[in-house]
Regions:
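Conserved aromatic beta-strand anchor motif in extracellular beta-sandwich/beta-rich domains
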Residues: 130-136
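Exposed beta-strand face motif in extracellular beta-rich ectodomains
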Residues: 168-170
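Beta-sandwich interaction modules
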Residues: 112, 157-161
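Terminal (often C-terminal
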Residues: 58-125, 134, 142-147, 180-200
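Exposed beta-sheet edge/beta-hairpin loop segments within beta-rich domains
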Residues: 101-103, 160-165
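Extracellular repetitive beta-rich solenoid segments
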Residues: 1-61, 106, 122-124, 135, ...
Length: 200
């Protein structure tokens, strides 16, 4: 019967769902793995079609876990930032200079957890405070105060869900009133901080 008549490109907004084949999706190759961060999806944003990277939709990142590998000395009676010089992982390369900085596009609710352990040189002390700072202030609710027994090398842990905006910073601090300058028990399971984004 000859070639099908070429009517050109349809006008914008004239192709409706009724004109699409029912296998437009099911007939294509299925993606059987978790999408890559740069994979793109099409969605309707209040009626306007937009393209979005998968990285902006998934929870669970950024995430990080860092720890202290070299012992740090902590002065008496002053809040001191804890050195976290080694990484187990840092999915978005967002941890640097002992600080986690929320990447652009990754604002949301984060679970932040931290632990600090004293070494065995400490005398008994009433205040061994572990604090998570947001933007230079301890306003996150992530604060715990623990007593330390002499020569026992115990410590304290703290965890909180914190609402963070892009470019917000998270740091780990310690305060004690032992009376002198004392050391931390460095190590992967002794002095560490971790965080993970759990949602918007």
């Amino acid at each position: 019967l000859g070639n099908v008549l070429d009517l050109g490109t349809p006008s914008d907004g004239t192709v409706t769902n009724a004109k699409l084949a029912q296998d437009i999706i099911s007939g294509e190759t299925a993606l059987t793995d978790i999408p890559a961060d740069t994979d793109e999806l099409l969605l309707s944003d209040a009626g306007t079609l937009k393209r979005i990277d998968y990285s902006l939709m998934r929870a669970g990142t950024p995430s990080f876990r860092v720890y202290q590998s070299s012992a740090q000395s902590i002065s008496n009676g002053t809040s001191t930032q804890v050195t976290l010089d080694s990484e187990d992982w840092d999915t978005d390369s967002a941890f640097a200079s002992n600080t986690f900085t929320v990447p652009a596009g990754k604002a949301g609710k984060y679970i932040i957890t931290a632990c600090i352990r004293a070494d065995a040189s400490w005398a008994e002390t009433e205040q061994f405070n572990v604090m998570i700072y947001r933007n230079g202030a301890v306003d996150t609710g992530a604060f715990v105060s623990n007593g330390i027994n002499a020569s026992h090398g115990n410590g304290a842990c703290v965890s909180a869900v914190i609402d963070l905006a892009a470019a917000d910073t998270i740091k780990l601090y310690i305060y004690h009133d032992e009376g002198g300058t004392e050391g931390l028990e460095a190590g992967q399971g002794n002095v560490f901080m971790s965080g993970i984004r759990i949602g918007a």
